[in-house]
Amino acid sequence: GVNMMHKIFKYNGKTINSSDGTILCGIVNVTPDSFSDGGRWYSSEKAVAHALELIKQGAGMLDIGGESTRPGSTPVSAQEEIDRIVPVIRELKKCTDVPLSIDTWKAPVAKAAIEVGADIINDITGFVGDPDMARVVGKSRAGVILMFNPVIARPEHPGSKIFPSFGGEEVFSQEEIERMAALPIQESMCFYLRRCIKIAHEGGVDDERIMLDPGIGFGLTKRENLLLIKDLHVLRDMGYCAFVGVSRKRFIVNILENAGFNMNPETEDGHENRDIGSAALTAISTMLGADVIRVHTISHHRMPSEVGNAVRFSEAIADVHLKQYGS
């Protein structure tokens, strides 16, 4: 179909081409409270060591964050965020060419990160949270990931109440907020992201430097999360590469708990099962055309992404006659 047209994404003069298959992006938390690894990687040495380990396992991108955005987390100042991530970026730039994405929605943090060599800004508000962000990225050569943020789009949703504030109150009118709340989630996403893209263009960021993220897991119902994955092609139909976070999402845990699996992260089985469940989502997202998938553990996601890519690009694969089993 139409959505298999090749998209490109440019950052710092380099190009990601959707015809090359899915890239796994490893999460590097430089926070004392991050939600899945209990702050095990706090301190820049540990963060750098973890990042290099993820690259060794096959990460083709890293997403470095200095502020946890999980439900109930405490916001940190821009300066604190800068102090956490800058040493990590500096160190990694010395020893790897893997693109470094910075998970921040604050313009001063993005500016400091870009100055020390960050390649991509991953803004979970889609340029809505900080009015200076689009200009900061516009003046640079960095790429940007614009995420649909349902917490901002639907402030009245009960799921939105548990998140810290992401700013952006002045971007959408009350009427637009009501409209997004009334629309089916996929249409709400398109409405929101079109506004983000407009803000990007106004700040000097052109289409080739933009990737879109459906915002899976941010204050949405289970049904809505599943619909956004199923309709991933919508982002490609809009003309952009797609970035998806699949890792350790509550709705996956819920689906598998309901099916009778142990998903308790305090137990070894449960912890492992969370990553296996996430990996299933990687196979599906890959097949549906995700260009980058953001994960906690690269090792669990490599096989599913290989299989997903094989199905996705099956038209292009040469016919190989396999030997009989056992021969």
Where in the sequence are the language-model features?
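Glycine-rich, proline-tolerant flexible connector loops at the mouths of alpha/beta enzymes
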Residues: S34-S36, G60-P87, G215-K222
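N-terminal amphipathic alpha-helix/helix-capping segment at the start of soluble metabolic enzymes
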Residues: V2-N29, K198-V205, N254, N258, ...
